[in-house]
């Protein structure tokens, strides 16, 4: 039977519940347990798919095509379990389902209330998402005390009672601030946060004390006394120089032993050797490169969370320190390509909307003409095709219909029909809703032998995740190919362009899919690894 660890946060937001939860999950997995994770988001949106990157950060796409919270990216990077649409749900999705049932008459005329109807649906989804895992860690978004979180907290209170204390525990993250003038950490915010939890019937079993300084034994003893938590279960988690140290930090304080004993699980000791290798490669690089990342959401780098981590993983794989130079594409429009000078490679990620697109196209032109290694992702592939059409074919009005519907050479256009991962045909028009209407999830891609992308993957067929509604226009493709642009990857039915490569260039690859969603610190990703190798070769050539 599945054991549940419910994870909440208090005092302030952004304490790192997702990373702390994923780190504990990684230790339990290293002990031979089957682990999964869920994220419960209190906002009213059905999913984050249409939310601004500046508000929400990255939208992480699962293998089965769900648009989810970026924490699911942390989960997949720390454990081997593949997340699905069942691993993330929101208040909006819960209410949508309950209201649909009410409209069908499933409740037989009952008055629909938060308790029991909404809380029952939350519990049902938690149990379904946990599946047959030995341990399921369930993270509740937001901060204890928020109005939005109350139905979720009530649901886990009920579920703890229903499954019993041997199968459910509560882990609470809290802030223990260090006051420099006093030279000590303060426990009062933690005491008040736990008091808030207890007022709604939830007693934490574990406290993770986040701080920029070690939380000393005296402070931990005081916290244990006033919160009714065992002293051994009050864990100090200070800031670290790489998040991949955290499993070892939690293991050293016996957190996994406490969990295993509490649940009565029989399992092996934790083998963290893989994480030790990751940390060693991260902190002891043998080489160094600088890569320009040209995007449009640079004010909130969480919008590119998986991509930034994927570049870090590629550095780990190549024993190379990867310095990312974050460049707003609008700055290139205003200041020119001087911002790109001296870099070893250029990366253009995905995005939506007209703003900053011309700056991205300029960055592509700089990379192509100056033989600088280039990797384009999603929109980064589309602007590569636009740049090639404008500056090689001479189609000066070439564009995407996303940005200019009147373009005389719409080399990129809306996908109106395609097959999804199940083989079902999806149809879209300009009038379709924005939410949940993109080409989403894992799709097969056929690679051309002898291409650079084939050299990276070392296989003929790959599976990568997608999130886009525009594609290269097949009607103009023959002229583009004739001018020299190489199509090195196509969809499984050969109908859609998935990867392009520039001719006469040391390393210029652009893909329609999002390889960052499947990169992990232990395994890296072949495309990013190949990109960093190309950047390293460029750096050594300049030296």
From Swiss-Prot:
Active site: 378 (nucleophile), 514, 516
Amino acids binding Mg(2+): 71, 139
Chain sites annotated for binding CTP: 13, 146-148, 186-191, 222
PROSITE patterns, alphabetized: GATASE_TYPE_1
UniProt entry tagged with the keyword Metal-binding: yes
Entry's family note: Belongs to the CTP synthase family.
Protein name in the entry: CTP synthase
């Amino acid at each position: 039977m599945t054991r549940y660890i419910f994870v909440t946060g208090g005092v302030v937001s952004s304490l790192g519940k997702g990373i702390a939860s994923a780190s504990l999950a990684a230790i339990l997995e290293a002990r031979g347990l089957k682990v999964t994770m869920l994220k419960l988001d209190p906002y009213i949106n059905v999913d984050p798919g249409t939310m601004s990157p500046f508000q929400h950060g990255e939208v992480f796409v699962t293998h089965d095509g769900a648009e989810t919270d970026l924490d699911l990216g942390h989960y997949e990077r720390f454990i081997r379990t593949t997340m699905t649409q069942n691993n993330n749900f929101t208040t909006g999705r819960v209410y949508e389902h309950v209201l649909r049932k009410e409209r069908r008459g499933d409740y037989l005329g009952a008055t629909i209330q938060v308790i029991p109807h909404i809380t029952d649906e939350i519990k049902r989804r938690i149990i379904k998402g946990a599946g047959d895992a030995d341990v399921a860690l369930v993270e509740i978004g937001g901060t204890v005390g928020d109005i939005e979180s109350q139905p979720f907290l009530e649901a886990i209170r009920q579920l703890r009672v229903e499954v019993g204390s041997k199968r459910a525990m509560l882990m609470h993250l809290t802030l223990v601030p260090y006051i420099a003038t006093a030279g000590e950490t303060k426990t009062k915010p933690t005491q008040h946060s736990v008091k808030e939890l207890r007022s709604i019937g939830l007693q934490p079993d574990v406290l993770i004390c986040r701080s920029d300084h070690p939380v000393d034994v005296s402070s931990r003893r005081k916290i244990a006394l006033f919160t009714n938590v065992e002293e051994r279960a009050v864990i100090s988690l200070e800031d670290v120089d790489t998040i991949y140290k955290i499993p070892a930090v939690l293991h050293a304080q016996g957190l996994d032993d406490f969990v295993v004993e509490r649940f009565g699980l029989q399992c092996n000791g934790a083998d963290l050797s893989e994480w030790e290798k990751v940390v060693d490669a991260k902190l002891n690089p043998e080489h160094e490169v600088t890569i320009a990342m040209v995007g449009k959401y640079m004010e909130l780098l969480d919008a590119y969370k998986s991509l930034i981590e994927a570049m870090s993983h590629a550095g780990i794989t190549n024993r190379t320190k990867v310095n990312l130079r974050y460049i707003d594409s609008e700055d290139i429009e205003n200041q020119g390509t001087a911002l790109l000078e001296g870099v070893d490679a250029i990366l253009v990620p995905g995005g939506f909307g007209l703003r900053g697109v011309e700056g991205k196209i300029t960055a592509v032109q700089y990379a192509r003409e100056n033989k600088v290694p280039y990797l384009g992702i999603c929109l980064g592939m589309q602007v590569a095709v636009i740049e090639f059409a404008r500056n090689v074919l001479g189609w000066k009005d070439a564009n995407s219909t996303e940005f200019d519907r009147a373009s005389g050479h719409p080399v990129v256009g809306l996908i109106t029909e395609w097959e999804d991962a199940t083989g079902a045909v999806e149809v879209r028009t300009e009038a379709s809703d924005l939410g949940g209407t993109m080409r989403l999830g894992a799709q097969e891609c056929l690679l051309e032998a002898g291409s650079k992308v084939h050299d990276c993957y070392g296989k003929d067929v790959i599976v990568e995740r997608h999130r886009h509604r525009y594609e290269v226009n097949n009607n103009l493709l023959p002229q583009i190919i004739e001018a020299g642009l190489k199509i090195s990857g196509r969809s499984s039915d050969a109908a859609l362009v998935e990867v392009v490569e520039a001719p006469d260039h040391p390393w210029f690859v652009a893909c329609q899919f999002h390889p960052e969603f499947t990169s992990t610190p232990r395994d890296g990703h072949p495309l990013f690894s190949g990109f960093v190798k190309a950047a390293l070769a460029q750096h050594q050539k300049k030296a």
